[in-house]
Design a protein with these regions (language model features):
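A structural "domain/chain start" motif
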Residues: 3-4, 18-37, 130-150
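Sec-dependent N-terminal signal peptides
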Residues: 4-13
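N-terminal secretory signal peptides
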Residues: 17-83
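Short, surface-exposed linear patches
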Residues: 61-62, 91-95, 112
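A short, surface-exposed beta-strand/turn
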Residues: 82-101
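Compositionally biased, intrinsically disordered linkers/stalks adjacent to structured regions
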Residues: 99-150
Length: 150
C-alpha cells in the first residue's frame, strides 16, 4: 500500500513539472576593436505565491494563486579579437496574474498562459539585448584597455 501511495505521489509531482520556455536572440554590435557577435538566451521562470485562506463551509474562500514570470537572461558575446564576455541577469515581471484557488491546481494552466505569451517574450529578449549593449561596450572597453596597456 505504501508503494502505491509513493508511486502516485511521484507521478503527481512529475506531471506538475512543466519545461521552462526559452527564447533566443542574436545580434552583432559594432565596437572600435571590431564587430562583436552577441547571443542572448532567455529562460522564463514562473514563481507562484499562495495567498488567502480556506473558509468554513457556507462561506466564500479567499484563496488565490498569485504568479509572476521572470526572464533569466544569459549573454555570450565573442569579439573579433577572440575575447568572450558572458553575463547573467534577470528581467522581472514580464508577465503576471492571479487565479482563484490553490496554486498546485493551476500550475499547468499558468504554464500554458505563459507559453501563449511567447511572442511577447521575443519582444522582451530584444529589449533586454538593446539595454545590454552599453554594458557590453563598457566591458569590451575595459578589456581592450587592459590588453593595450599591459
Amino acid at each position: 500500500m505504501t508503494y502505491i501511495l509513493a508511486t502516485g505521489l511521484i507521478l503527481g509531482v512529475a506531471s506538475a513539472t512543466v519545461p521552462a520556455a526559452t527564447v533566443d536572440h542574436a545580434t552583432r554590435i559594432d565596437h572600435h576593436s571590431g564587430p562583436v557577435d552577441a547571443r542572448y538566451r532567455g529562460t522564463v521562470a514562473v514563481s507562484h505565491r499562495q495567498v488567502g485562506s480556506v473558509a468554513p463551509g457556507g462561506r466564500a474562500s479567499t484563496l488565490r494563486c498569485m504568479w509572476s514570470a521572470n526572464m533569466v537572461v544569459d549573454r555570450h558575446a565573442t569579439a573579433a579579437t577572440g575575447t568572450t564576455m558572458t553575463r547573467n541577469f534577470v528581467r522581472n515581471d514580464i508577465a503576471s496574474g492571479s487565479r482563484a484557488g490553490w496554486c498546485d491546481t493551476h500550475r499547468n494552466s499558468i504554464a500554458k498562459e505563459v507559453a501563449a505569451r511567447m511572442q511577447d517574450m521575443n519582444g522582451h529578449i530584444v529589449a533586454v539585448a538593446q539595454e545590454d549593449h552599453d554594458v557590453l561596450r563598457a566591458e569590451l572597453d575595459r578589456a581592450h584597455d587592459k590588453t593595450r596597456n599591459g
